[in-house]
Regions:
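Intrinsically disordered, low-complexity serine/threonine- and proline-rich regulatory segments
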Residues: 1-9
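Short, positively charged loop/turn segments that connect secondary-structure elements
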Residues: 2-3, 33-59
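Hydrophobic residues on short alpha-helical segments
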Residues: 10-14
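Short capping segments at the starts of secondary-structure elements
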Residues: 17-27
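Short, hydrophobic-biased segments on the C-terminal half of alpha helices
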Residues: 63-64
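Glycine-centered, phosphate/nucleic-acid-interacting loop/turn motifs that mediate DNA/RNA or nucleotide
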Residues: 70
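Accessory beta->alpha helical hairpin/"wing" motif in late/C-terminal subdomains of nucleic-acid enzymes
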Residues: 73-97
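Mixed-charge (Asp/Glu-Lys/Arg
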Residues: 88-161
Length: 161
Protein backbone atom coordinates (compact mmCIF):
# COMPACT_ATOMS: atom_id res chain seq x y z
CA UNK A 1 0.00 0.00 0.00
CA UNK A 2 1.25 3.48 -0.81
CA UNK A 3 1.52 5.91 2.07
CA UNK A 4 -1.51 8.22 1.90
CA UNK A 5 -0.93 11.88 1.04
CA UNK A 6 -1.44 14.53 3.71
CA UNK A 7 -4.82 15.52 2.25
CA UNK A 8 -5.96 11.88 2.30
CA UNK A 9 -5.01 11.80 5.98
CA UNK A 10 -7.09 14.82 7.02
CA UNK A 11 -10.34 12.81 7.23
CA UNK A 12 -8.85 9.98 9.33
CA UNK A 13 -7.29 12.54 11.70
CA UNK A 14 -10.59 14.39 12.13
CA UNK A 15 -12.51 11.12 12.53
CA UNK A 16 -10.07 9.89 15.19
CA UNK A 17 -10.36 13.15 17.13
CA UNK A 18 -14.17 13.15 16.87
CA UNK A 19 -14.30 11.19 20.14
CA UNK A 20 -13.39 14.48 21.86
CA UNK A 21 -10.20 13.12 23.43
CA UNK A 22 -7.06 15.28 23.40
CA UNK A 23 -4.33 13.21 21.76
CA UNK A 24 -0.61 13.55 21.25
CA UNK A 25 0.82 13.72 17.75
CA UNK A 26 2.53 10.39 18.35
CA UNK A 27 -0.75 8.77 19.42
CA UNK A 28 -2.52 10.12 16.32
CA UNK A 29 0.29 8.92 14.05
CA UNK A 30 0.43 5.42 15.56
CA UNK A 31 -3.34 4.95 15.75
CA UNK A 32 -3.90 5.94 12.12
CA UNK A 33 -0.92 3.85 10.97
CA UNK A 34 -2.54 0.87 12.70
CA UNK A 35 -5.96 1.66 11.19
CA UNK A 36 -4.37 1.78 7.72
CA UNK A 37 -2.37 -1.41 8.36
CA UNK A 38 0.87 0.29 7.36
CA UNK A 39 3.92 -1.93 7.37
CA UNK A 40 6.94 -1.16 9.53
CA UNK A 41 8.79 -0.14 6.35
CA UNK A 42 6.04 2.34 5.44
CA UNK A 43 5.99 3.74 8.97
CA UNK A 44 9.75 4.25 9.06
CA UNK A 45 10.38 5.43 5.46
CA UNK A 46 12.30 8.71 5.43
CA UNK A 47 12.85 11.38 2.79
CA UNK A 48 15.97 11.07 0.64
CA UNK A 49 17.46 14.40 1.73
CA UNK A 50 16.05 14.80 5.19
CA UNK A 51 15.73 12.56 8.24
CA UNK A 52 11.97 13.09 8.68
CA UNK A 53 9.66 10.11 8.47
CA UNK A 54 7.27 10.45 5.53
CA UNK A 55 4.11 9.18 7.25
CA UNK A 56 4.69 11.11 10.47
CA UNK A 57 5.37 14.28 8.44
CA UNK A 58 2.19 13.85 6.40
CA UNK A 59 0.14 13.41 9.58
CA UNK A 60 1.75 16.57 10.96
CA UNK A 61 0.79 18.55 7.85
CA UNK A 62 -2.76 17.16 7.94
CA UNK A 63 -3.01 18.32 11.56
CA UNK A 64 -1.56 21.73 10.66
CA UNK A 65 -4.09 22.29 7.88
CA UNK A 66 -7.00 21.16 10.07
CA UNK A 67 -5.80 23.47 12.83
CA UNK A 68 -5.45 26.45 10.47
CA UNK A 69 -9.04 25.86 9.31
CA UNK A 70 -10.20 25.83 12.94
CA UNK A 71 -11.38 22.20 12.87
CA UNK A 72 -8.91 21.10 15.53
CA UNK A 73 -6.93 22.95 18.17
CA UNK A 74 -3.72 22.40 20.06
CA UNK A 75 -4.45 22.85 23.79
CA UNK A 76 -0.86 21.91 24.64
CA UNK A 77 2.33 21.54 22.64
CA UNK A 78 2.21 18.52 20.29
CA UNK A 79 -1.41 17.68 21.11
CA UNK A 80 -4.62 17.99 19.14
CA UNK A 81 -8.29 18.13 20.06
CA UNK A 82 -11.35 18.59 17.87
CA UNK A 83 -13.21 21.92 17.98
CA UNK A 84 -16.98 22.38 17.84
CA UNK A 85 -16.67 23.27 14.13
CA UNK A 86 -14.57 20.16 13.59
CA UNK A 87 -17.23 18.10 15.32
CA UNK A 88 -19.88 19.48 12.94
CA UNK A 89 -17.73 18.51 9.95
CA UNK A 90 -17.01 15.05 11.39
CA UNK A 91 -20.73 14.44 11.98
CA UNK A 92 -21.61 15.58 8.45
CA UNK A 93 -19.91 12.43 7.10
CA UNK A 94 -18.22 14.43 4.37
CA UNK A 95 -16.95 12.14 1.61
CA UNK A 96 -13.60 13.83 1.23
CA UNK A 97 -11.94 16.49 3.28
CA UNK A 98 -9.55 18.41 1.02
CA UNK A 99 -7.98 21.82 0.49
CA UNK A 100 -10.95 23.05 -1.52
CA UNK A 101 -13.24 22.27 1.43
CA UNK A 102 -10.89 23.99 3.90
CA UNK A 103 -10.87 27.15 1.73
CA UNK A 104 -14.35 27.98 3.05
CA UNK A 105 -12.74 28.94 6.37
CA UNK A 106 -11.32 32.46 6.53
CA UNK A 107 -8.53 31.43 8.89
CA UNK A 108 -7.37 28.80 6.41
CA UNK A 109 -7.49 31.27 3.51
CA UNK A 110 -5.35 33.67 5.52
CA UNK A 111 -2.88 30.87 6.26
CA UNK A 112 -2.64 29.97 2.56
CA UNK A 113 -2.48 33.58 1.37
CA UNK A 114 0.69 34.50 -0.48
CA UNK A 115 1.54 38.12 -1.16
CA UNK A 116 1.93 38.22 -4.94
CA UNK A 117 2.72 41.93 -5.12
CA UNK A 118 6.42 41.29 -5.76
CA UNK A 119 5.87 38.77 -8.55
CA UNK A 120 6.51 39.78 -12.16
CA UNK A 121 3.45 37.89 -13.29
CA UNK A 122 0.40 37.55 -11.08
CA UNK A 123 -1.32 34.26 -11.92
CA UNK A 124 -5.01 33.82 -11.35
CA UNK A 125 -4.93 30.04 -11.13
CA UNK A 126 -3.79 28.30 -7.98
CA UNK A 127 -1.46 25.36 -8.04
CA UNK A 128 -2.88 22.60 -5.88
CA UNK A 129 -0.54 19.88 -4.70
CA UNK A 130 -0.79 16.78 -2.59
CA UNK A 131 2.85 17.08 -1.58
CA UNK A 132 3.93 18.54 1.72
CA UNK A 133 6.45 21.40 1.69
CA UNK A 134 9.09 18.92 2.89
CA UNK A 135 8.35 16.64 -0.06
CA UNK A 136 8.62 19.53 -2.49
CA UNK A 137 11.95 20.56 -0.97
CA UNK A 138 13.19 16.97 -1.18
CA UNK A 139 12.22 16.84 -4.88
CA UNK A 140 14.00 20.13 -5.61
CA UNK A 141 17.15 18.99 -3.81
CA UNK A 142 17.20 15.69 -5.71
CA UNK A 143 16.66 17.50 -9.02
CA UNK A 144 19.48 19.92 -8.23
CA UNK A 145 21.83 17.04 -7.43
CA UNK A 146 20.99 15.32 -10.71
CA UNK A 147 21.51 18.51 -12.72
CA UNK A 148 24.76 19.25 -10.91
CA UNK A 149 26.06 15.72 -11.60
CA UNK A 150 25.25 16.01 -15.32
CA UNK A 151 26.88 19.44 -15.61
CA UNK A 152 29.89 18.33 -13.59
CA UNK A 153 30.29 15.23 -15.77
CA UNK A 154 30.00 17.26 -19.00
CA UNK A 155 32.48 19.88 -17.77
CA UNK A 156 34.93 17.20 -16.63
CA UNK A 157 34.77 15.52 -20.03
CA UNK A 158 35.39 18.82 -21.79
CA UNK A 159 38.54 19.37 -19.73
CA UNK A 160 39.89 15.91 -20.52
CA UNK A 161 39.30 16.24 -24.27
Amino acid sequence: MAIPTYDELMSPVLKLLSDGVERSGEDITNTIANQLNLTEEERSRIYANNPKKVFKNRIAWARTYLKKAGLIESPQRATSKITSEGMKVAKSKLDKLNLKFLEQYESFKEFRHIDNSNLVENRSEKIETVQTPDEILDFVQNSYKKIYKVNYYQNSRALVL
